[in-house]
Every structure is written in structure tokens, then in C-alpha cells.
Amino acid sequence: MYGKFQQHLQEELKAIEEAGLYKKERNIASAQSAEITLQDGSKALNFCANNYLGLADSPRLAAAAKKAIDARGYGMSSVRFICGTQDIHKELEKAIADYFHTDDAILYAACFDANGGVFEPLLTAEDAIISDSLNHASIIDGVRLCKAQRFRYANADMADLEAKLQEAQACRFRIIVTDGVFSMDGNVAPMDKICDLAEKYDALVMVDESHSAGVVGPTGHGVAEQFGCYGRIDIFTGTLGKAFGGAVGGFTTGRQEIIDMLRQRSRPYLFSNSIPPMIAGAGIEMFKMLKESNELHDRLQANVEYFRDRMMAAGFDIKPTQSAICAVMLYDAPLSQKFAAKMAEEGIFVTGFYYPVVPKGQARIRVQLSAAHRKEHLDKAIAAFIKVGKELGVI
């Protein structure tokens, strides 16, 4: 049987490669940071990590992780409800709830699991999910696992959202679901307007803060802080794998009864091992760091403004951004790959994104800024973009 299936896969893979859509991995042989060493020994500046606050190689977090291993061991060998809950898991959940001004929080192995496990326990075929068209794949998959009726509105389009809410008025419960920051374009969801519509049409609100927590808002606390929406958002999901240290682990935080129900019925929570003690210990320390100072957030914002302004002045087509994501639009998939390859030759580590990660004809280089970037890093990257952009006729 595998012979026929193997041939089918080989043909599919060949077609992907011929279309210029084949994704290849580049191996890093150093800690994740602004400056990295690749497996071939070459050095590069990294502008494609989710390391927004530059904490991925934080000595303080590494020390906290080591301390947790020494005190609580390497792993849990259990799910939470059997014997996989330690005191530090509960302490981290409390820190997350405090950060987002919510009642309680629940930990997952990843935010993909948090989004995949949030809808099915809470909603039935009598209910409606109204989801932004550019929401993350994990939200899309989570919605698919649920029997609720599905409505999709155009990205951040409040008129279309209102129309979909009107369509869903006959449903028992309605929930509006959005990313806080949309990962490919870098735009921020207008949470105040979303909450206004939710109140007008009696709907719940859920936001995925994966790319916004630690980044947007006056002190980096995400879209609820930026738009003054504390108390108006029912469910937050997020990750420890981006601004919050860059490791693994996801979470859902929100109203008490919602979190209680997820503990009882969310399948990724019930049937997956607990996050290891070292992740919990480092996560607790990370939230302590963010309470102490806004320095990392402020440095990140200064880097974003500096890079964006100079790239636009150079003539690049840049998506409007209010986050740490800067999308340099190229539109052509093979061009995005070629551009990324030439940037690597200049010592700049970026990735071309193209279909199916973004819609066809919307290929781009997604630049992600970090608090770890210094001015000389930014200047070198901008100079490389200008050089390669001129070579390839982009500017």
C-alpha cells in the first residue's frame, strides 16, 4: 500500500518545490538571541524570531529554570488532574491571571492547544462563533472541532462584524474571537470597538494575545491595556513562547467559571502532560521581571519606530504596524525566497512567507523586532535590505 501512497507524496512534494513553496529549515547552533551562530559556523543577526523582549537567552530566566529543576525535577510524567500539578504550576497561573487582570488561568503545552481546547467544552450547535478572517491557524482548528455555527468577518472590519452578529442573533450564545495582533500583517485588533459591538449584541469576547502581550499597550500588557478594555474581555489566550521568554507553554485566562469548565472538559488539558517544572519556574521569574520595569518594552518600541521609519523612507512597501511585526511586502513567492537567501548572504536572518502561510500573491519578508536588537543591528539590517532591494528591483 505504501508504494502508491509514497508516489503520491513524492509528486505532491515535487509540485510544492517547483512552485517555489517548499519550506526549508536552517539550523541554529547557539542560543536564540539577536546575534546567532548557524550550524555551518556563520554568524547572523536574527530578525525573524518571536523573541520580542529579548528574554530567550536571559541569564535570570535560565537560572530560575535550573533552580526549578533542582527543586522540582525534570518532568511531571502525568496530566494535571492525576498527579501533574505542583505548587509552581498554580503560582504561574496566578501570575498570568494577575498580568491580564482576570480571575484565573489554566496552562497548556502550547497556545495551539489552548485555542484548540477552548471552544468545544463551552459551546454547542445552539451557539455561534464569529471569527476574524485572519485569525491564527490554531483558532481556526479549534473552531472546526466545535459544533457551534461559524461566522467569519473581514479582518478588523467592524461593519462586517456587526452584520455577522446580526445574522447570529437567533443563536443561544455568541462569541467574537480575534487575534490581538495579526501575525502576518502586524496590525492590532480594535478591541474597544469589538467590545462595544459585543455589548450591543450580547456576545462574549475572546482574544489571542500571543503576538500582543508584552508588546502593545503603554506598558506592554496587550490589547486590553491599549484600548482600556479590562473587564470587557471574557477570555484571553496566549503563549510563553514569544515575548514571555520564548520557551514553550500556552495558557487561557479569563472569568472563573470559564476556567473551571476548561479544567473539567478541555481535552488538550486533560490528556496532555503538564508543562515541566523548569518552564513553570522560569515563567514565574519572567512575570516578576516585567513587574519590576518597563525597560524592555520601551526599548522594543523604540526599535520598531526606528526600523519602520527608515525602511519606509528607503521606499519599501511596509504594512501599517502597531506591533513588533513589520511586513515587507514582495507579493511574489519565489522572490521572497530569493530575497531571504540574499539577506542571509549579508548576515541577516529573515524568512520569506508565502502561500499557504499567507494568501497567494501576498508573499513578504516578515521582520520581527526585539528589545535585544541594538542600533548597530538595526542599521546593518536596513543597509542589507536596501542593497538587496536594489539588486532585485524591489526599490
What are these regions (language model features)?
Residues 118-137:
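Conserved PLP-anchoring active-site segment centered on the Schiff-base-forming lysine
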Residues 79-85, 94-117:
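Short loop-beta-helix segment that forms the pyridoxal 5′-phosphate
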Residues 244-311, 316-319:
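PLP-dependent aminotransferase class I/II
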Residues 59, 63-67, 71, 94, ...:
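PLP-dependent enzyme catalytic core of the Aspartate aminotransferase-like
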